[in-house]
UniProtKB/Swiss-Prot annotation:
Name assigned to this protein: Type I iodothyronine deiodinase
GO molecular function terms attached to this record: selenium binding; thyroxine 5'-deiodinase activity; thyroxine 5-deiodinase activity
Function of the molecule: Plays a crucial role in the metabolism of thyroid hormones (TH) and has specific roles in TH activation and inactivation by deiodination. Catalyzes the deiodination of L-thyroxine (T4) to 3,5,3'-triiodothyronine (T3) and 3',5'-diiodothyronine (3',5'-T2) to 3'-monoiodothyronine (3'-T1) via outer-ring deiodination (ORD). Catalyzes the deiodination of T4 to 3,3',5'-triiodothyronine (rT3), 3,5-diiodothyronine (3,5-T2) to 3-monoiodothyronine(3-T1) and 3,3'-diiodothyronine (3,3'-T2) to 3-T1 via inner-ring deiodination (IRD). Catalyzes the deiodination of rT3 to 3,3'-T2 via ORD.
Active-site residues, record numbering mapped to chain: U126
Length: 257
């Protein structure tokens, strides 16, 4: 084992202990002060839109916090961020992804000249991803002539056999590429109006872009010019709109100097 690999495992150990302490503390506080903890979780939910999501009542998701499933999911997300290779201003990782036909391709295959490419990572079991899906579709409509868009379907955020919410979309964790492709096909019912591909079963793009549970990026000429903060708390398609308004010149308009 090399020094860099040893250092990675040490960082993973530290994160494991941090998450374990956070979850244990949260569990104790939820037992002693259930109403206060519930109000704190609901306050966080306001930022993601969960409290405005008509599909979910608080009892569908608040009690799942600090469970063992919560622990493993949060740990996976924190560990994944150690693999982040998508730096603002740097070259975008040219990961392998899979079209819904089953054909392999790369992220860079969707870059067209100097047109910005928006990457939208998420899954059907991620409530904020679906809640804000119409916002994303409006971006596609408004900038279709000057930018390109790609949805990369990654592992489920709240799979039925993982950190599950009641009344959520019923999808189990992907055991095979076919499972992931079937899950991504469900997204087509929402008319995404842009290409949809899936991450590999090695979760390469999700890891290198630190995209779990959802995230937005903008790439131009192979470089990252916008790196959205991790979801669900900071997943914001309207930030992408502001970026595209600066990068894209509407047809028939000339820049003013």
């Amino acid at each position: 084992m090399g020094l860099s690999q040893l250092w990675l495992w040490l960082k993973r150990l530290v994160i494991f202990l941090q998450v374990a302490l956070e979850v244990a503390t949260g569990k104790v506080l939820m037992t002693l002060f259930p109403e206060r903890v519930k109000q704190n979780i609901l306050a966080m939910g306001q930022k993601t839109g969960m409290t405005r999501n008509p599909r979910f009542a608080p009892d569908n998701w608040v009690p799942t916090f600090f469970s063992i499933q919560y622990f493993w999911f949060v740990l996976k997300v924190r560990w994944q961020r150690l693999e982040d290779r998508a730096e603002y201003g740097g070259l975008a990782p040219n990961c392998t992804v899979v079209r819904l036909s089953g054909q392999k391709c790369n992220v860079w295959d969707f870059i067209q000249g100097s047109r910005p490419l928006v990457l939208n990572f998420g899954s059907c079991t991620u409530p904020s991803f679906l809640l804000k899906f119409d916002q994303f579709k409006r971006l596609v409509d408004d900038f279709a002539s000057t930018a390109d868009f790609l949805i990369i379907y990654i592992e489920e955020a709240h799979a039925t056999d993982g950190w599950a919410f009641k009344n959520n979309v019923d999808i189990r964790q992907h055991r095979s590429l076919q499972d992931r492709l079937r899950a991504a096909h469900l997204l087509l019912a929402r008319s995404p109006q842009c290409p949809v591909v899936v991450d590999t079963m090695q979760n390469q793009s999700s890891q290198l872009y630190a995209a779990l549970p959802e995230r937005l990026y903008v790439i131009q000429e192979g470089r990252i010019c916008y790196k959205g903060k991790p979801g669900p708390w900071n997943y914001n398609p309207e930030e992408v709109r502001a970026v595209l308004e600066k990068l894209c010149i509407p047809p028939g308009h000339m820049p003013q100097f």
